[in-house]
Amino acid sequence: NMDHYMELDYFKANSTIALYSLYSDEPTYYVPFAAVDASVAKEHDSYFFLRRFSVFEPWVLSDDERENTLTPEEIATVDESIAEIRARSMYAVPEIEVDSTDRILALVTCSYELPDARFTLFCRALREGETPESVAAIVQNATAMN
């Protein structure tokens, strides 16, 4: 239940997400780096333009394509988006680094905390050398932002 990620203790205790695919026998593991609860209605103060990420091409490229084809402008756009996501997050997890070369997963569900709201859990794929256990130890340092 994604709503549980709105609680810091649950966020810390469930620090990796396994994504199973038809294309691999092994799951891809992701670590959450931000949790955003915001309205998707422009007239609300907490408005967050979530739909821009649904067609954000650099995040749907393969790892090799992303590393070899992003222009400096695209890299800057990705980095700005990551910075905005982190600034809007309910939690701070600064030790989990995220940049334009990472594969990002956004899990979205309806939220009833705000009008027309969506709760979004932003995660990045584990990097080479990381394990679910190693990032779990880092996520334990997460703190509430507000």
Predicted regions and their residues:
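Extracytoplasmic/periplasmic soluble domains downstream of a signal peptide or transmembrane helix
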Residues: N1-N146
